[in-house]
Amino acid sequence: MDTQMARAPLAVRAVLFDLDNTLVDLMGMKRVASDAAARAMLAAGADFPFSADEAGDILFGEYLPDLESDSVFEAFLRKHHRRALGMGQHQVDRITAAAVNAYLRAKMLRTEPYAGVRPTLVALTKAGLRLGVVTDAPRFKAYQRLEAAGLPDFFEFVLTFTDSGERKPAERPFRAALDLLGLPPHQVLMVGDRATQDMAGAKALGLRTAWARYGSPGAPVPLEAEAVLERVEDLIRLIPLAADRR
């Protein structure tokens, strides 16, 4: 934990977690799965003007603007296939299906919590802290990731974009979480990897904030972060784990 921040423990009664790149390594999973999908496209007959390794890198880059996209594979195929204009829909569907299948297989194998997440959640739960998730992911995809990582039972609730209709840093997702907890903002800690969406959004409503540096390596420390987590286990030292919280 950053020794220049949060010198005093944060006395809170609940912890809200972002999901992607905070609890699970979404970017790592997407990179591995994109590589698998690109190789499957080539094996199914795609003709790209670059190598398999380059195809995976390019596909991952085209995923970044919308990590929840369901159409990226067909769009990638039509954009980069040497004879895209001559492809019939059967060929498009076959190659795209191969990509989706390979992507899903890799996704299931690679969707896992960061090291230390489970023991940290166990320690926080045993201490009586209430835990929730506030994510911009759609509900179904959020639960896919949580289930694959074996984490959903740790949380009292999972608030998604499907539920709130707005993405962080809008107030609505955070207010919805506070309403479910029935706690004032200063008794709730928000943990996330994004400066604007997680840290600034939570701080604007008076929540306490801890930035997951491990989920955004190389990014500058957000001004709104009260603490910096080098790894998720730093939460155990950051929050007084009093036995009488319940």
Indicate residue ranges for each PLM-predicted region.
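Asp-based, Mg2+/Mn2+-dependent phosphohydrolase catalytic module
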Residues: 1-15, 28, 43-44, 87, ...
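N-terminal helical cap/lid subdomain that shapes the substrate entry/recognition surface
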Residues: 7-115, 140
